[in-house]
Amino acid sequence: MEKYNAIKIVKGSGGFGGPLTVKPEEGKDTLLYITGGGAEPEIVEKIVNLTGCKAVNGFKTSVPEEQIFLVIIDCGGTLRCGIYPQKRIPTINVMPVGKSGPLAKFITEDIYVSAVGLNQISLADSSAEPIKSTKVPEEGKREFKYSADKKVSQSLAENSKSSIVQKIGMGAGKVVNTLYQAGRDAVQSMITTILPFMAFVAMLIGIIQGSGFGNWFAKILVPLAGNGIGLMILGFICSIPLLSALLGPGAVIAQIVGTLIGVEIGKGTIPPSLALPALFAINTQCACDFIPVGLGLAEAEPETVEVGVPSVLYSRFMIGVPRVAVAWVASIGLYQ
């Protein structure tokens, strides 16, 4: 009887990507989950039972990439969505998010699947071929003077002594290509990230104003957001280590509360000068869910991750109230 079994993962309602067929193997049998607050998603236990792999909480320790056969995230569409697909590690997102974030180009259907729940995971057929991230061995290549993937000017510049004219031409070409690619990336980021966010905020403001929720919430919010002391209390709540990692994913909480505060400032309920300390108060928890991923990108040792995650969480807790107080002092006299 085989030690490990292959599973098939399909996208859920509103999801993207897949289906993925994955199977652990000796030395590459770790299921890494990096979800808000280090909470274990319900699908982890099912995957472990079906495959025979071992699960590791990315908030508590790190795992060498060569030992990871599958990653589970709960990203709402930011950088974390594309980090592991970029490394060609099969990725499950429990949120219904598609090609989104600055690494969207790496999020493809053959390595990523989203909106995954218990019903989307099952044992794979014996004939199914699991994903294998193997490097293609390099074969000896015959040398040619010209190449189909390079311009004549590039080939001449590489294969012969470049003249001043060639150097100037190549330099100008690189500058133009760099600017052109920067423009393409900027437009792509606008389409995939900024415009959807603007639409989300517009919809949220419409719901708040149309439903009357804003008036009800304003009565609760004004005692906190309407003065500096209240904002420091709000910053204290958002910086509590047990809550900050849960409030961080996708910055959804900060977006909603920020929109509500912005609407109330526009209506005159909250003084405009409190916009600055309010910004610091509602963003104290930002990126607290990203700490293990960031340490992993820096190739931190497991011991470093174990110490680094609580260190950052507690450092945010210690500076949560002081940063709001400094912003409150700096906002005195604004818009007057």
Curated annotation (Swiss-Prot):
Q: Specify the protein's topology with respect to the membrane.
A: Multi-pass membrane protein
Gene Ontology biological-process annotations: phosphoenolpyruvate-dependent sugar phosphotransferase system
- Coiled coil ranges (UniProt) are none
Q: Supply the induction statement.
A: Activated by sorbitol and repressed by glucose.
- Identify the keywords attached in UniProt to this record, alphabetized: Cell membrane, Kinase, Membrane, Phosphoprotein, Phosphotransferase system, Sugar transport, Transferase, Transmembrane, Transmembrane helix, Transport
Q: Where is the PTS EIIB type-5 domain?
A: 3-195
A molecular function (GO) held by this record is:
protein-phosphocysteine-sugar phosphotransferase activity
Q: Its Enzyme Commission number?
A: 2.7.1.198
Give the residues annotated as active site. Answer: C75
* Location within or outside the cell: Cell membrane
Q: Which GO terms describe its cellular component?
A: plasma membrane
Phosphocysteine is found on: C75
The record's InterPro entries line, in alphabetical order, gives:
PTS_EIIBC_GUT_C (IPR011638), PTS_EIIBC_GUT_N (IPR011618), PTS_sorb_EIIBC (IPR004702)
Catalysed reaction(s)? D-sorbitol(out) + N(pros)-phospho-L-histidyl-[protein] = D-sorbitol 6-phosphate(in) + L-histidyl-[protein]
Q: Which PANTHER family match?
A: PTHR39427, PTS SYSTEM GLUCITOL_SORBITOL-SPECIFIC EIIB COMPONENT
- Show the domain comment: The EIIB domain is phosphorylated by phospho-EIIA on a cysteinyl or histidyl residue, depending on the transported sugar. Then, it transfers the phosphoryl group to the sugar substrate concomitantly with the sugar uptake processed by the EIIC domain.
* NCBIfam families named in the record: EIIBC-GUT
Q: What does this protein do?
A: The phosphoenolpyruvate-dependent sugar phosphotransferase system (sugar PTS), a major carbohydrate active transport system, catalyzes the phosphorylation of incoming sugar substrates concomitantly with their translocation across the cell membrane. The enzyme II complex composed of SrlA, SrlB and SrlE is involved in glucitol/sorbitol transport.
Listed name of the protein: PTS system glucitol/sorbitol-specific EIIB component
